[in-house]
Amino acid sequence: KQRLEALDIELPKPILLPVILLEDAQNIPVATTDSTPIIRRLEQEFSDRGAIPDNPALAFINYLLEDFADEWLTKYMFHYRWHFKEDADNAGTILPLVEFEKSLPVKEHKQIKQYITQRQTERLWVVGSSNETAELIDQSFKRFISMLNKHLIKSPFLLGDRPSSADFAFYGQLSQLVKFDPTPRKICHDFNLKLSVNL
């Protein structure tokens, strides 16, 4: 947010990750967010190295997997990051250092950590995360990781020998689940997830 404001570039609505600058029809940089429209735009501009399979059946499966990643893997990530105290403390401590100066005064860091943690934990209901649904989300994630691991043992990517837009969508969420948040990281390591080596 601060970087875009410093460049006098209008903030995207809503602010999601990733955010990249793409030029509009007048060659003015515009902050563009959400991987799906970004990939679709890049597909049009750089058609020689596409991330969407040429085969219509595979392209359809790719869209389904990409949508699953955007809608459901996000729920896993948000649930694990903010539902459990250890994970929320971890994220609340680190995220202010990503968005703000690394050398925040201790008091200011503590205030930002408290604000972010409270804001995000109060939004858990948006992704369907609660004490009542926690076990269901956990079982679903473990089932997903087990199936993904079996697939990745046979194939380096979701749809074959090269990455697709579905792989990129999976990567965004799985990089956090495998590397950043303590609870899902342990689950992935317990499953010996092949992907964790590649992230």
Cite the ranges covered by each PLM segment.
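GST-like domain detector, emphasizing the conserved glutathione-binding G-site
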Residues: K1-K107, L158
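GST-like fold's C-terminal all-alpha helical module
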Residues: K75-L199
